Each structure stands twice: as structure tokens, then as C-alpha cells.
Amino acid sequence: MRYISRTVWVLSLVSLFTDMASEMLYPIMPIYLKTIGFSVALIGILEGIAEAVAGLSKGYFGKLSDNRGKRAPFVQLGYTFSALAKPMMALFVYPVWIFFARTLDRLGKGIRTGARDALLSDESTPQTKGRVFGLHRGMDTLGAVIGPLLALLFLYFYPGRYKVLFLVAFIPGLMAIFATLFIKDKPVKEQEAIDKIKTGSFFSFLKYWKTSPADYRKLVIGLLFFALFNSSDVFLLLKAKEAGLGDTAVIGVYIFYNLIFALFSFPLGILADKIGLKRIFIGGLLCFAAVYLGMSMSHHLYAIGALFFLYGVYAAATEGISKAWISNISDQKDTATAIGTYTGFQSLCTMLASVIMGFVWYRFGSTVTFVLTGSAAVLVAGYFIFLPTFARHE
């Protein structure tokens, strides 16, 4: 795989270790917070604030990375913050401290995302971006498979030792920090470094929307419209639980989904480079629609398992592909800003989608909620079908 550079492999390993640490804690986070006195409402506020911080900071730090002409420092600092936040959650149980630690974790994600994806873009060509972003997403998601399995194994031998698990999760976080030390920036030409010091306000990245290429805006409008209907995966797990699956089976289908996501990301990236990013992305949207429409009427373990398989294919066909697509139609000097602006808005839309889906579920039931979501995905797929192809390899 000559087109996969050393930097891409390092970034992929860093993401694997980081996601391993995060996903070790994901299944037990709500349980731990409730044991230290957090109400469901307070947990919701905590996650909402954390996601808002992550979303807004992605755009700002993406633009800052472009302005400074640097990628590595943002990647290193971002992953360090996220790693340090894990054991901090176990040190004290005061709500203010928990809010600080959780926000630090998401701030780390905001700092690194734009710069990391710009590095991936810099290390690829229009002909290889699908497979480069696909490999990275696959390794990242492999961590999401290993993490919960390690957590289940730990809690099997040490039930209820949640604080210790937070400390154990620091180990892969440390490995990620160490790996980031091998990431180096490419030299920036002197002419390209002119006026790089001006950074602007925290919301200055929003100005990029006005000056960005029209093709970028058309693409991102479609992506954000989809994000408004693409709520948290928690709702799929709740639907599986409602259909009669036990706790172990629910965790099992979640791990299965991540495994399929990891296995299919790189092959679909290769296929996207051959037949076009747009075609693979639309195929992913149709998989998403099939999953939500299918979940609205499925009540058997095997049917739900098949739908979670399809959900893993959807994720592999869209998550890395969308960033590769954006980087293909953005100027190289603005790549971090372009991706950071999109992922920032995407985080906010996803948060809003979860609120809307929760309300619709409460008011009209899960079946109506899933049918509406699946139908909306079909409409978004139609938008992309009629969207012009912007570049040779889309």
C-alpha cells in the first residue's frame, strides 16, 4: 500500500488508541454518573455542553491551524487533552469538576479534528483520498470494537470498579500521546506563511462560509440537512431494547456494528476512489434509510442484527467519504477550516437532531420517529443524486 504514508499510519494508530480509551468508558459513563449523584437531566446538560464545545471549537481551531500553517501541534495538544480528561473523571465527584473534565475531553476533539483531517488530505491525492480517509476511519472504529470488549472483560472480573476503569483507560490514551510525537508538519513555503498570525475571534471561522467555493456550500448544505435527522446511536440501541433484546444483546449488536464499520471503511474507500465518492456516499444514505425503516417494524434478533450490519456499512460509506469529498473541493490552504467548519456545524445539528428525535419519540412513539428519519434520508439521497459532480474523483 504505497499510497498510505507513514503519517497516515501514525494518525490511524493514534485514533485507534484514543477511541479504544473513549469506548472503554462509553457503555458505563451514564451508570458511573448516576452512581456519583448525577440525575438524567444533569447528564443531558453535561453531554449537551460538551458537544457544543466540541462543535464550535472544531471550526475555530481548524481556521487557526490554517492561519498558522501548522497541523502537528494541534493534533498533539488535542489528543493530549482527551487522554488526560479520562483519569480526571475519577479523581473527584464534584459536578463542576466532572463538567470541567468532560468539557476538556471534547475540547481536545475540537482542537485536533480539523488539523488531523487536513493532514490526511495533505498525505493523499484526489485519486487516493477515499482509501486514506477510509483506512483512518477503519482503524478509529476498530478501537471502538476493542474498547467495549476490554471494558466488559474488566467489569466481569472487577464488577462496579468504575473509577479504576477510568484509570485503566488512561493507558491507551498515553500510547496515543506517545504516537503523536512521530507526527511532523510538512515545510511551509515562505510566501504561504504571510499573514498567518492573524486568527480573529472564536467565531471568525464562520466568515469562511461566505468566502468558500459555491460547490462547498452546496455539498455542506446537503450534509447538514442529513445531520438534522441523524441523531445519536443511543436511539437505535433503545429501539433494539424496546424490540425485546436483553442488555447483553444490545451491547453485542453495538460492538457488531462497530466491527462492520471498521472492516468496510477501507474497502469502500478504495471503491470510492474507483467509481466516485458521490456514488458511495449516496449508497450509504440509502443503507441508512433501510436501517431506520427496517427498525420501525423489526422485533427479531436476527433481523435487528442484519440491520446493524447494514448500519455499519452505512457508516463506512459516509463518515470518511464525506471528509474526503470536502477536501477534494477545498483549497489546500483552507482544508482544516473547511472540514472544521463542517464538522462543527455537524456536531450542533446532531445534538439538535437528538433533541428533536427524543421529543417525537415521546409524543408519537418510536415507529413514527424511525419512519420519518428513514424517509428524510431518502430525500437527502435524492438531493445528492441531482447535485452536480464537482470534481473528477467525486
What is the meaning of each model-derived region?
Residues 1-54, 215-253:
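Helix-loop boundary and gating motifs at the non-cytosolic
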Residues 31, 35, 146-164, 352-368:
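Transmembrane alpha-helix termini and helix-breaking/packing motifs in multi-pass membrane transporters
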